[in-house]
């Protein structure tokens, strides 16, 4: 009888130089290394401004999934290497730029509230600043409307205690003084206020309305005030 030949060892039984078994299929390493990017403070202000304009232009007109880093680089007229150096990936570019835009809004709002004591006047000023932002930054409003609610935490300003407290202090003070509705928790009153602004802002931009929102400010504030103030005050 001819001698039987033993079968060669399968790939799963072979060993590599380290003595570990080899696999016929390489397993993908699912571990990810956090991106290390350069501080944004090191980027030239003029370059950052160009990136901001590009982000607002591109993301306002298209779905975020359709935008690429190459498009952002070309529109901003900066190198792709620069984008990766300071941001690392597309999502970080978007969230960082939106944080800068909203950060300026926060600073302006807090500046305008200085020295105003009346609850109604403080609420009026807060609404005016927000609506003025919608009128002057329609592209930013569109970009924000496309950010998933689950991703809002990626925009740092949404966790900015100074900004949130600036909003809440106006409403909390109003409740304590017996001016604003106190039959619901403070956060519900805050949601009513933000929902009013958000809906107005998004629809104003979608409709491409020619007249700015603040052209009807008195009427809009009256609606908001009646919804948030105690009935006996709103009817005065």
Segments predicted by a language model, with ranges:
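Hydrophobic alpha-helical connector segments
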Residues: 96, 110-136, 190-193
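C-terminal peripheral helix-coil segments that are non-catalytic and often amphipathic
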Residues: 1-38, 132, 169-177, 207-236
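Helix-turn-helix
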Residues: 50, 54, 58-92, 96
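Amphipathic alpha-helical segments used for helix-helix packing
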Residues: 133-153, 202-203
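Short, structured helix-loop boundary elements
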Residues: 44, 48, 69, 91, ...
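Short, hydrophobic secondary-structure boundary micro-motifs
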Residues: 68, 141-145, 153, 179-183, ...
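Generic hydrophobic, amphipathic alpha-helix propensity
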Residues: 44-55, 72, 97-105, 167
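Amphipathic alpha-helical packing segments from all-alpha helical-bundle domains
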Residues: 103, 152-179, 187-195, 202, ...
């Amino acid at each position: 009888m001819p001698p039987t030949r033993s079968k060669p060892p399968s790939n799963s039984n072979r060993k590599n130089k380290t003595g570990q078994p080899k696999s016929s299929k390489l397993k993908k390493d699912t571990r990810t290394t956090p991106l290390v990017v350069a501080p944004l403070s090191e980027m030239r202000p003029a370059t950052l401004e160009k990136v901001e304009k590009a982000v607002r232009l591109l993301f306002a007109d298209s779905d975020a999934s359709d935008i690429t880093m190459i498009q952002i680089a070309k529109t901003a007229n900066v190198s792709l290497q620069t984008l990766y150096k300071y941001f690392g990936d597309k999502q970080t570019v978007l969230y960082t730029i939106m944080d800068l835009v909203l950060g300026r809004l926060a600073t302006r709002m807090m500046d305008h509230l200085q020295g105003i004591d009346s609850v109604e006047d403080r609420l009026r000023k807060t609404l005016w600043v927000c609506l003025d932002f919608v009128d002057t930054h329609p592209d930013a409003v569109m970009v924000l409307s496309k950010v998933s609610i689950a991703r809002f935490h990626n925009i740092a300003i949404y966790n900015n205690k100074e900004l949130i407290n600036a909003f809440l202090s106006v409403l909390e003070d109003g409740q304590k003084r017996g001016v604003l509705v106190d039959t619901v928790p403070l956060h519900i009153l805050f949601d009513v206020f933000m929902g009013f602004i958000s809906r107005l802002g998004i629809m104003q931009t979608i409709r491409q309305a020619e007249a700015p929102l603040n052209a009807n400010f008195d009427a809009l504030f009256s609606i908001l005030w009646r919804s948030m103030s105690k009935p006996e005050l709103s009817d005065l």
